[in-house]
Amino acid sequence: MQMRSNDEVDRSIVQVPEIVQVPKGMLAFAKQFQEVMMMYTCAIREVKTKFEVLNDELSVRNKRNPIEMIKSRVKKPMSIVEKLSKRGQPITLESMISNLDDVAGVRVICSFLDDIYEVSDMIAKQDDIKIISIKDYIKNPKENGYRSYHMIIEVPVFFSDRKQPMKVEVQIRTIAMDFWASLEHQLRYKAAGEIPQFIAQELKECAANITNSDMKMQKIHSFLEDMDRFALK
């Protein structure tokens, strides 16, 4: 599909009959919003690259990849509006940038529990990364059983005329934690956010079982690593 320049888009809007013309102020806002979303997308790219580099390094050093998968997303406009409204904040770009830390999100899926803390520590130690906040929902799970390691970080993004610090939410979790969170989200969405108490309890028990499995897998992995170290001596 052939892409059109911004000038062509502007001209096409001007040529539309007056009754359906887009107000100039709205057009300017749309362009500003597009630019800000581009900046968040670039911030995601920077953070993903950092984790990919760490994964490559650790795959050589430890002979395995601690990161199974890296996912990312930029928050949808409607989600941004809903979150700002819920917090009683004005619906503006300035408000979004100031009040929302999770417009840009990166999710890192690790193999084992120890991998989560290893890669998060390595990211935190990088001198161009600023840690805004950390929430450890692994050691302190949410009431519904949700477990994950959350970081809000600020990363510099270099553009043609400036260096812009951008906030990115990073979620680090195991495969099992991601499996539970994904299914819980689907079920909650299907129930329109209202899950019966007995279902909520079942989900919480599933989360506890998954946690036990994660801990057992970590013990097995650590035991096998110890065996390898002793074999090399």
Q: Predicted regions: what is each one?
A:
Residues 2-44, 51-57, 168-233:
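An acidic, glycine-/histidine-flanked metal-binding catalytic module
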Residues 36, 40, 44, 77, ...:
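Generic alpha-helical secondary structure
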Residues 43-48, 52-89:
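Surface-exposed, low-hydrophobicity interaction/linker segments
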Residues 67-70, 96, 109:
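Glycine-rich, low-complexity intrinsically disordered segments
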Residues 76, 92-93, 196:
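General structural signal for secondary-structure boundaries
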Residues 91-101:
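Short, flexible, solvent-exposed loop/turn segments with mixed acidic/basic and small polar residues
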Residues 97, 110-219:
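Long beta-strand-rich cores associated with HINT superfamily self-processing modules
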Residues 102-106:
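Short amphipathic alpha-helical segments
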